[in-house]
Amino acid sequence: MNEKEKVNQITEGVIWKQLLLFFFPIVFGTFFQQIYNTADTIVVGRFVGKQALAAVGGSASQIANLIVGFFVGLSSGAAVVISQFYGAKDKKNLSKALHTAFAFSIAAGIVLTVVGIFLTRPALLLMKTPADVVEDSAVYLHIYFGGMVFNLVYNMGAAILRAVGDSKRPLYVLIITCVLNIILDLLFVVAFGMGVTGVCLLYTSDAADD
């Protein structure tokens, strides 16, 4: 077994220690994800106003979470297949699975971008979004859908890294992104006065950086 094959072999050595080393970065990642989301809410609520907070955290947020949750599930499914090929050292099928997973993420992201932008307003009205926040919610979702490809590719990439036993690199990326998010939240929303648009542009640029 060469050096590359020894990387991220979580079943080697003392199993419970390896599992804890794999588990804790995921837990901390969830913590930083909550900080990421909370920072947006605090900055918008404190410096923009109730209407903007309702636009970011209301129906628009529910639609965004629904889409992300769906693709996190798909990423987890792809990760199961990839982990099986990785564990079996089946490099041929592993390569095919990786290419298929990323190609699907890109294709689905493009489709969702187009469909989402066209259906944003009807979806908000269907959810009985208050009239005074529909416009800001629509702006938020239009920009959100514009960055959908980056979002899906990141989620797929993070799931694949965890599938091969590497839960640390997704955590490092998330920590860096979280810190940048807080700094740029204040810059875009407070200094530049961009409001809801600034928050969503920041989300999209962070997803691209991921």
Q: What is each residue range found by the language model?
A:
Residues M1-F23, I82-G147, I183, A191-D206:
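Short alpha-helical transmembrane segments in multi-pass integral membrane proteins
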Residues F31, I35-A54, L124-A131, L187-V196:
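Helix-terminus/linker motif at the lipid-water interface of multi-pass membrane proteins
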Residues G157-G165, D185-M194:
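Membrane-water interface regions at transmembrane-helix termini and the short interhelical loops
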Residues S75, I143-R162, P170-C178, V199-S205:
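Short runs within selected transmembrane alpha-helices of multi-pass transporters and secretion channels
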Residues L53-V114, N151-P170:
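Small-residue-rich hydrophobic transmembrane alpha-helices
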Residues L21, V44-N65, A131-D136, V196-L201:
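Interfacial/gating helices of multi-pass transporter permease domains
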Residues W16-I35, I63-F70, G146:
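Residue-level signal for short hydrophobic patches within transmembrane helices
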Residues V27, F31, I35, A39, ...:
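Generic alpha-helical transmembrane segments of integral inner-membrane proteins
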